[in-house]
Amino acid sequence: MKHHLTPLDATQLDSWRALAAHRQELQDFRMRQAFIDDPERFKRFSFSACGLFLDFSKNLIRQDTIDLLVKLAEEARLSDAIRAMFDGEAINASERRPVLHTALRRPIGDKVLVDGVDVMPEVHRVLHQMTELVGYVHNGLWRGYTEKPITDVVNIGIGGSFLGPQLVSEALLPFAQKGVRCHYLANIDGSEFHELASRLNAETTLFIVSSKSFGTLETLKNAQAARAWYLAQGGTEEELYRHFIAVSSNKEAAIAFGIREENIFPMWDWVGGRYSLWSAIGLPIAMSIGISNFKELLSGAYNMDQHFQTAPFERNIPVLLGLLGVWYGDFWGANSHAILPYDYYLRNITDHLQQLDMESNGKSVRQDGTPVTSGTGPVIWGGVGCNGQHAYHQLLHQGTQLIPADFIVPVSSYNPVADHHQWLYANCLSQSQALMLGKSREEAEAELRAKGLPEAEVQRLAPHKVIPGNRPSNTLVVERISARRLGALIAMYEHKVYVQSILWGINAFDQWGVELGKELGKGVYSRLVGSEETPAEDASTQGLIDFFRGRHRG
């Protein structure tokens, strides 16, 4: 029985019921006391894989919790589901497609069949095509319409054609190649285009239009704006091919735009947008960091793929993180999850993981179309430390919601300044420690008395200084951010999302909810510009249309 055809209702499994009973046993569990009772707790609940060190000891778990979660994964036939994905089965059931972003990072010589055809030769042909293009640009051989070498590459794309590539190219800035600057244009807001164009020279700018359909509204409008800007700056239609390339499965539309066929990189139906940075969608990454580092990124992801497929569940990073997510969401009532990178270069990882997790697991029906019987994807949010400590960490520490968190931190910085990195690392650890330890009423009172405050003032202030603690977190440590480790980190989160989708019985690889707004947007636009006179479907939308039409000037 295939999970994507007949998904299990995990809530009916014996292990799910056992976990529900176990949750009640842990009602008074305190992590602070657990560390006192078990000096080996850190060693028991931490390990390394693929260049990542995971400490999951600061969680609301005992060893029997992990045993029960692993039992849940086994009863849900997670191993079969993992095998089905890597074997190319059509696990995206609603669209009847395989899910094979993992094929993009497999070595040459491997064999992956889609409809009986081995796709690996085509994968490596495109990688070779990327290698040639990046080499031409970096060596100054790709010239603009005035024969000047390209100095700026602009990626025009949105969603998965933007978030993943932006994350990687900025996370790996220490590896940026000299002579070529990379930029991203995603939003349809004209101000974004204006600000970017003001920093560019049309003679030396290459645009990458990334859209599977070559019809994504925001991307097409920005591509048209870039084309008009290029022509206004002195470029010609005849030389347009020097300044525009495409990543798309709609070759005809890209050619009609003016892009030469040999400069169109393919996309495949078996790679979803939010999983596509490993494909030619990653061209801006390769332009930024060089093709050899891009291949290191692929290698790191491949290493995580191997770990995911072969490591026992109790020592499998994506499996454990996925199980812990289900533990908190379905048994502790957690509705969100914080991503807290303590590294400036990783500042965009939360944006990418928001799409990866929320677009994948933001579902309310199972693979077979029946309603889910459990909670599904959480809200993903967060941001770079230490900034968050002076903003939303207050809610993490003293708010009423249980919000699990992932701390991500490197041991070494590429840019050491005095003892800044030691303080950064210390802040990361102390935040996870504070979430776990908290501060009792007795400790708060003792602290205030030690400052010499009168007893009345101690009693007045003490309740405000109590911090509940017992808030769960994981800490992921890398020695230093590199292409290989970053590839492993991103692939880890991809697989974590898949694990959770299996336990919830949902399809992590479609996104039908995104389409409704697009469809309605066309009607709203027609009414805004006056080409559609019938009123909108509701009074609120029509009122806002009227407000715009009564005030908009140009």
Curated annotation (Swiss-Prot):
Localization per record: Cytoplasm
Enzyme class: isomerase
Disulphide bonds in the chain: none
PROSITE patterns: P_GLUCOSE_ISOMERASE_1 (PS00765), P_GLUCOSE_ISOMERASE_2 (PS00174), P_GLUCOSE_ISOMERASE_3 (PS51463)
Domain of life: Bacteria
Keyword Cytoplasm: yes
Primary location group: cytoplasm
Alphabetized InterPro entries for the sequence: G6P_Isomerase, G6P_Isomerase_C, Phosphoglucose_isomerase_CS, SIS_dom_sf, SIS_PGI_1, SIS_PGI_2
GO molecular function: carbohydrate derivative binding; glucose-6-phosphate isomerase activity; monosaccharide binding
The entry's keywords: Cytoplasm, Gluconeogenesis, Glycolysis, Isomerase
Residues passing through the membrane, by range: none
Similarity remark: Belongs to the GPI family.
UniProt xrefs under HAMAP family: G6P_isomerase
Protein name as catalogued: Glucose-6-phosphate isomerase
Gene: pgi
